[in-house]
Amino acid sequence: MDFISIIQSAPPIILKKLEDLKGLRERPDYHPEPSTFHHIEIVTNRLIPTENMDLILAGVLHDICKLDCVRVNPKNGHPTSPGHDVAAFNLITETPEIQNWIKGMGADLIKVAHICLGHMRFHQLGQMREFKREKQIQDWKDQGIWDALAIHGAADNMIEEFDLNNLEKSWKWKRS
């Protein structure tokens, strides 16, 4: 299994969005890769060795709506895509073709959607007060997605080297 074979089975709406993301260059200090498409490919390839289809498809879909939400940050001139996590969640939960693809690939639709929804909040855990952070982590544990988010969050960080055996090293935040 590789990224290309996974996306070749995706519905046309996903293929179109992926193609369009080849033209979106993100903030280079967080995303040194050439485009959002390449970022998605890297994240997905990092997740394939887990053999967890929930994670693998979340890798494909987590940034799928970045172009839909993009705007220029007036402070630094870099593109930003606020709300792309919510937009991806909505796209997944409201599009039968995507739902059928996820299920057909052997993944859990609800888990994939919630990993996509939580992926930005995961990166912000280090900015939260300890009580709020631990409550959020417990909520994700209750949803059955904490372990997957911990892996996805490490795979999604382009600044640190990804190490499946040492996830916290790759997180954008450090546990106190």
Identify the meaning behind each predicted range.
Residues 1-73, 77-79:
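Acidic/His-rich, divalent-metal-binding segments that scaffold phosphate/diphosphate chemistry
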Residues 46-165:
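Divalent metal-dependent catalytic cores for phosphoryl transfer on phosphate-bearing substrates
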Residues 161-162, 166-175:
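Long, amphipathic alpha-helical surface segments
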